[in-house]
Amino acid sequence: MTDDKDAKLIEAGRKLFARDWQFIWASPSIQTLPPMDGVEIAFAGRSNVGKSSLINALTGRNALARTSHTPGRTQELIFFEVPGKKDLRLVDMPGYGYAKAPKSQVASWTELIHKFLLGRASLARVYVLIDARHGLKDVDLEILGTLDRSAVSYQIVLTKADQVKPSELASRIAETEAALAKHPAAFPNVLATSSRSATGMAELRAAMAKLLEERSS
């Protein structure tokens, strides 16, 4: 990709996420999902990995997605879009893995996650968020396996990159990319981000603008 093309995508991403993003729907079950309009991009990850914070940073809206220090606070599929626009919809998924909730409830929304990933025709990409301090865990690999079966393209995004040393971050990226070699549906490169410092946000916005451009052409 040329520098000129990069710059155009960065600007397209900036404009895309400068729009008036709003909450539109919350689905506690597959039966309550909204109609499949346009392109959907979902954000998955372990509980408390920073999905809601990332969505807020992308959109520049500090309170768009509810954030919490309590693992497992997001227990539904939360949908966001720009009113009057049907081109792109963002999905904040329940966190998987450890959560401060009854086991039956955790099992219910874990099932919801897997069913959504396997059966949503409008789902164009999933960003799987991994805490840069901890790397891939077994529960993450389970989700990657589900995504491999679903044939939905996905990419790993490291969160909280500002909380690790540059050398540690480089090692984390390298080991994660090596693990992805076993997953054919995964993008081979890993994005490092920080919601706090905005590291990687322009690149992530540009990647989504590129996807939207490809889908509309």
Swiss-Prot record:
Belongs to the TRAFAC class TrmE-Era-EngA-EngB-Septin-like GTPase superfamily. EngB GTPase family. HAMAP family: GTPase_EngB. Mg(2+) binds at residues 52, 74. One of its GO terms (cellular component) is cytosol. SUPFAM superfamilies: P-loop containing nucleoside triphosphate hydrolases. Its cofactor is Mg(2+). Necessary for normal cell division and for the maintenance of normal septation. It comes from Bradyrhizobium diazoefficiens (strain JCM 10833 / BCRC 13528 / IAM 13628 / NBRC 14792 / USDA 110). PROSITE patterns: G_ENGB. GO terms for biological process: division septum assembly. GO terms for molecular function: GTP binding; metal ion binding. GTP binds at residues 45-52, 72-76, 92-95, 159-162, 193-195. It comes from the Bacteria. Gene3D superfamilies: P-loop containing nucleotide triphosphate hydrolases. This is Probable GTP-binding protein EngB. NCBIfam families: GTPase_YsxC (TIGR03598). Residues 37-214 form the EngB-type G domain. Keywords: Cell cycle, Cell division, GTP-binding, Magnesium, Metal-binding, Nucleotide-binding, Septation.
